[in-house]
Swiss-Prot record:
Pathway(s) the chain acts in: Amino-acid biosynthesis; L-leucine biosynthesis; L-leucine from 3-methyl-2-oxobutanoate: step 1/4
Domain annotation Pyruvate carboxyltransferase: ranges: 12-274
Cellular component, GO annotation: cytosol
UniProt function note: Catalyzes the condensation of the acetyl group of acetyl-CoA with 3-methyl-2-oxobutanoate (2-ketoisovalerate) to form 3-carboxy-3-hydroxy-4-methylpentanoate (2-isopropylmalate).
UniProt GO BP: L-leucine biosynthetic process
Protein name as catalogued: 2-isopropylmalate synthase
Keyword presence, Transferase: yes
Reaction(s) catalysed by this chain's protein: 3-methyl-2-oxobutanoate + acetyl-CoA + H2O = (2S)-2-isopropylmalate + CoA + H(+)
Cofactor(s) needed by this chain: Mn(2+)
Gene from which this protein is expressed: leuA
Length: 519
């Protein structure tokens, strides 16, 4: 994201704390291997600093930080430490083998924390800052000091703390909105005042770290930069304590998109953001909300007819960034009751249909009626609306019978009889489990190149006699089809769903073949 017109004074350092603050989110614990995967990803996408963990918290955390420090090629690797000598020693040991290591130490500064948590006086805390920052600086050249709960700390005392930390050797000063209490103008002003009043402020980089308790984490982070901060601490997907942290993807795209009013830049490659979101979501088992900015499923999806019409004519009518800029292939037009005729026609063309005006209008009327009754409209639903012969085409493959031999030892075996274009074929196959055997039998009887993307089983009702509803998604030539089938026998339902998906692929190929030949 660098530009010849920008300078280092306008550069914003991106400090990712997904592996430390993000993992403190209840339920978001990652395995050692998952931490290494996330760290490698962050290192390659242009993140400047990776806070890899809290080394003294556990043996596992120490080992993860140490391993990440050894492996990182680009990013500074930071280890967190309380203002306790043993913590600082442990953090120093963890980042010792990093190409560029950092110790990040912190202490509370607000009256409520000093009185009720630390039970220390203001002078006591100033002494702690001097001693612990100096200790850290003796171990590494890069030391970050944080004033915990800085936004509820009186400005005069906060200035004294910052001056003390810099004098002791801190190279970065982080002023976190620990409890998500600040509002943007207040936070911007705090940085401006401190940088003006602290005599040695020019010897350190100032940093923001904002929590989202009031939904202002990203706004506050950007306000802090306007006040003179040049490091933003954030996490992928905004995960973190309580309501979370500033989301890295939102911070990066705000800087990239609004350069007209925020003349800053950062090193993160924006096309990696969607993949990063998915990797962290999978590692933490925390799903990304559908309407999440930048990386949510609906971030580039449009259902309103007015919006769909505008996007089809010119994407910039309703999109302030391109989906490709964040690693999404294309804008998604979600077909539903709000969709207009233009978007419906566009979807039909994607599916290989070119209808006359009267046919299009008739299909559109039936589509709107279906959308009023059905929550989710799939491509297959639309195909069924406009193809009167679709049902017969889907019956080209039909399950006649299925026998599966399963046991506790050895491979499972499936014997299947399928009707293909009116002719019965029979064959058998083995697999690692009965479902695998069934699907292998289908492949033997009906050779194809489709890949299985999804296999799900749900009980339709309660009880041991419940029907099983099986969903199968197959992909071929970069396009996917989904089919469902229900049966009291899960294996029969699985076979029917798989065959139904193949029928849809065959139907699509037949429909598009004349178009391909004509082109």
């Amino acid at each position: 994201m660098t530009s010849p017109s920008t300078s280092d004074k306008d550069r914003v350092v991106i400090f990712d704390t997904t592996l430390r603050d993000g993992e403190q989110c209840p339920g978001a614990t990652m395995t050692h291997e998952e931490k290494l995967e996330v760290a490698e990803m962050l290192d390659t996408m242009g993140v400047d600093i990776i806070e890899a963990g809290f080394p003294i918290a556990s043996v596992g955390d120490f080992e993860a930080v140490a391993e990440i420090a050894k492996r990182a090629n680009n990013a500074v690797i930071a280890g967190l430490a309380r203002a306790i000598p043993a913590d600082i020693v442990r953090a120093g040991e963890a980042v010792r083998h990093a190409k560029r290591g950092r110790i990040h130490t912190f202490v509370s500064t607000s009256p409520i924390h000093l009185a009720h948590q630390m039970r220390k006086s203001e002078e006591d805390v100033l002494g702690i800052i001097t001693a612990t920052v100096a200790q850290a600086r003796n171990l590494v050249d890069d030391v970050e000091w944080s004033a915990m709960d800085s936004t509820r700390t009186p400005i005069d005392y906060l200035c004294r703390c910052v001056e003390t930390a810099i004098a002791a050797g801190a190279t970065t000063i982080n002023l976190p909105d620990t409890v998500g209490y600040a509002v943007p103008e207040e936070y911007r002003r705090m940085f401006k005042v401190i940088r003006e009043r602290v005599p040695n402020a020019d010897k350190a980089v100032f940093s923001v770290h904002c929590h989202d308790d009031l939904g202002l984490a990203v706004a506050n982070s950007l306000a802090g930069v306007e006040g003179g901060a040049r490091q933003i601490e954030c996490t992928i997907n905004g995960i973190g304590e309580r309501a979370g942290n500033a989301a890295l993807e939102e911070v990066v795209m705000a800087i990239k998109t609004r350069g007209d009013v925020m003349p800053y830049w950062c090193n993160v490659e924006s096309t990696t953001l969607t993949r990063a979101s998915k990797v962290v979501s999978a590692a933490t088992s925390f799903p990304v909300q559908y309407n999440k900015a930048i990386v949510g499923r609906n971030a580039f999806a449009h259902e309103s007819g007015i919006h769909q019409d505008g996007v089809l004519k010119n994407a910039q009518t309703y999109e302030i960034m391109t989906p490709e800029s964040v690693g999404v292939k294309q804008t998604s037009l979600v077909m539903g009751k709000h969709s207009g005729r233009h978007a419906f026609q566009h979807k039909l063309r994607e599916l290989g249909y070119e209808l006359a005006d009267n046919q299009l209008q008739d299909a559109f009327v039936r589509f709107k009626a279906l959308a009023d009754r059905k929550k989710d409209i799939y491509d297959e639903d639309i195909e069924a609306l406009v193809d009167q012969e679709l049902a017969q085409t889907h019956d080209r493959l039909r399950l006649v019978s299925l026998t599966v031999i399963a046991g506790t030892h050895g491979p499972q075996r499936a014997t299947m009889k399928v009707e293909v274009d009116g002719k019965v074929r029979i064959d058998e196959a083995e697999g690692n489990g009965p479902v695998d055997a069934v699907f292998n039998a289908v492949k033997t009887l009906v050779p194809h190149e489709a890949k299985l993307e999804l296999y799900q089983v749900h009980a339709v009702t309660a009880g041991t006699d419940a029907q099983a509803e099986v969903s199968v998604r197959l992909s071929q030539d970069g396009r996917s089809v989904t089919a469902r089938s229900s049966d009291p026998d899960t294996l029969v339902a699985s076979a029917k769903a798989y065959l139904s998906a193949l029928n849809k692929i065959i139907s699509r190929q037949q429909r598009e073949a004349p178009v391909a030949a004509a082109s």
